[in-house]
Amino acid sequence: MGDLELLLPGEAAVLVQGLRSFPLRDVGSGGWNQQHESLEKLNMQAILDATARQDEPIQELLVTHGKIPTLVEELIAVEMWKQRVFPVLCRLEDFKPQNTFPIYMVVHHEASIINLLETVFFHKEVCESAEDTILDLVDYCHRKLTLLVAQSGCGGPPEEEESQHSTPMQELQKQAERMDFEIALKALSVLRYITDCVDSLSLSTLSRMLSTHNLPCLLVELLEHSPWSRCRRGKLQRFEGGHWQTVASSEQQKLSKLDGQVWIALYNLLLSPEARARYCLTSFAKGQLLKLQAFLTDTLLDQLPNLADLKGFLAHLALAETQPLKKDLVLEQIPEIRERLEQENRGKWQAIAKHQLRHVFSPSEQDLRLQARRPS
């Protein structure tokens, strides 16, 4: 790990080997919190490794020990907890937390995992080691990007300023909304890295991306709405590095990292032979994709020269006949994690919330002091 060491030699391997999936009922428990702490350490070390452009042992360890599927499962589990258990918990009469830190830890867990996945998915072998859970991850990314498009039509995430009149729980809910926005942006990067592997993805995964979710058209919507850009007091701002930053006039034509991720994903999905053979260019898809022509300026092509090929593809598409929507007669795999979690916990959301209220989210002062010392 060179000079930049957060974890001692051998410590990272122990942490990776210990990663496991938890039942939803155990979210926030002692063992779960220890794993959250481990993930934070692995996260920081992975970022240090990537920044130093040296060997990246965290990514190698996750692949070697087959832990990418575990991370995907934990990601979807905490997403489901936030959607199914958290709202029930907030409605319980007895739920009057003196301290919201233990709940913040759970809400933050999804951000921790997607951040780690974004760091390591840059490497194609990580994508391959996800095995069948790549379908679940594609679905997860699609859910996040759909919410991002929807959110861009109603003002984006709440502002960062705290209100003097907010209760701790109201502040936590605002924090969770802001975090969801950042999580969606990370999911965009993960999806782009998955499209880098389009030539080695299974037919089921390609079909999921191109037919079930029609990701090329969703990506066009993202470019149109650009939810990571906004105008405030006549000045352009972009969401970068975890907060909104005003863009200098001289930098406004410069391609943002997030716009770049969308363009690269579109390039991969529309120009790779494997994807082109699977994508049905209906009249709707043609209409959506031709909107890209207006964005393909000389300034953009100077920054991403490969997009000249995409420009040529669109010129050809403008003259091409559209295809009727067809259903491939392929025996397809389907994502299993979310459906399994739904089945295992159906009708139990209230019981899980009550259990966690008693055993997890009513900590003693000593518990709170211990948790506050951990990285978050």
Write out the residue ranges for each language-model feature.
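Extended alpha-helical interaction scaffolds used for oligomerization/partner binding
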Residues: 2-375
